[in-house]
Amino acid sequence: METLIAISRWLAKQHVVTWCVQQEGELWCANAFYLFDAQKVAFYILTEEKTRHAQMSGPQAAVAGTVNGQPKTVALIRGVQFKGEIRRLEGEESDLARKAYNRRFPVARMLSAPVWEIRLDEIKFTDNTLGFGKKMIWLRDSGTEQA
């Protein structure tokens, strides 16, 4: 649980996620502002259905990605690598996520793009502020944490 708490605290301070999807051997990545839900261990993003990455995702798809800062020194590198599943939200689930997203990013009220959830199943958090190459790993299904 301590690993997930540390990861969640760091993710709550960031705001841009990069995620990648593949379809028929073709890969594509995209960036978006995100809202992180520590209880569900999921990102919520907005993206138009007409985008290449949304078209490749369809209603749901496997996904991998990163969240990282831009430190000027190696000793301060912190970042997350993850894999999971992306899906477009519908109905009440979408409405609730959009309200929370709009609280974090008020400018999003002007956007009509659908809400998507990236459910994280595996997270690797690198935190060089704890020592060079320090890694923490969290896995959803097994509840496993490695520090």
From Swiss-Prot:
GO terms for cellular component: cytosol
Gene3D superfamilies listed in its UniProt record: Electron Transport, Fmn-binding Protein, Chain A
Origin superkingdom: Bacteria
Family in the record: Belongs to the UPF0306 family.
HAMAP family: UPF0306 (MF_00764)
Name under which the protein is recorded: UPF0306 protein YhbP
Organism: Escherichia coli (strain K12)
Gene it is expressed from: yhbP
